[in-house]
Amino acid sequence: MASLLKVDPEVKLKVDSFRERITSEAEDLVANFFPKKLLELDGFLKEPILNIHDLTQIHSDMNLPVPDPILLTNSHDGLDGPNMKKRKLEDREETFQGTKVFVMPNGMLKSNQQLVDIIEKVKPEIRLLIEKCNTVKMWVQLLIPRIEDGNNFGVSIQEETVAELRTVESEAASYLDQISRYYITRAKLVSKIAKYPHVEDYRRTVTEIDEKEYISLRLIISELRNQYVTLHDMILKNIEKIKRPRSSNAETLY
């Protein structure tokens, strides 16, 4: 079959070397890195910063004071009766356009520093999981034999493993999107507070979003740990079929 396609011997040697490197790295990931990482993340979940029960402790100062109300008089020369009422309604509509903000009174509006600290620890863990899953996925894909009739149950287990690894990659990538959406949503709300400083609901919404993000970050760390547990367990239970898909009779997946 090799004669049907001419392959440069030097290139083939480099490809074989790459396959060996991927195999060695992936097997070490499954056997050693995954269990160590799940224990590390489990320990992270027990740290005090991730076990705050009173969520008011993660609230941050808006640094946007409520300005004194501006007193407006609705009396206009030469206007009284119905004309004056009409002018009052027009003035009221004009005052709801919000405040033009050219500079913040107390300087830059900072993010919630406690959440930023957690995010800066979580993001590298997310990227690491994506990278390691990609390596293990490539390893399993390289182990899939050529398509032929007969006992393909082991191949189906390999494909199932690849699908699970791909799902974990996608979910981990969605965590990064979630963090970006938090920053964007919070920035828009803070801008609203700057424009409408007297509206308390905007201020309350920012604290609600911070609380929600804190809970979400803890959930993300839990999911990262659980994904390491699941992948480690699934691959170990099926390692014989993954490495030698057609070496024995069909067995159940687990």
From Swiss-Prot:
State a GO cellular component annotated for this protein: cytoplasm
The UniProt entry, under Pfam families, shows: PA28_C, PA28_N
Q: How is it modified after translation?
A: Acetylation at the major site Lys-195 is important for oligomerization and ability to degrade its target substrates. Deacetylated by SIRT1.
Q: What does the record give under GO molecular function?
A: endopeptidase activator activity
Is the rRNA-binding keyword given for this protein?
Answer: no
UniProt keyword Acetylation, yes or no: yes
Q: Which UniProt keywords apply?
A: Acetylation, Proteasome
For the modification N6-acetyllysine, the affected residues are K6, K14, K195
Fetch the InterPro entries from UniProt: PA28_C, PA28_C_sf, PA28_N_sf, Proteasome_activ_PA28, Proteasome_activ_PA28_N, Proteasome_activ_sf
* Record's function text: Implicated in immunoproteasome assembly and required for efficient antigen processing. The PA28 activator complex enhances the generation of class I binding peptides by altering the cleavage pattern of the proteasome.
Q: Which family does it belong to?
A: Belongs to the PA28 family.
Q: How does it assemble?
A: Homoheptamer.
Indicate what this protein is called per its UniProt record: Proteasome activator complex subunit 3
What species is this protein from? Gallus gallus (Chicken)
The taxonomy runs:
Eukaryota, Metazoa, Chordata, Craniata, Vertebrata
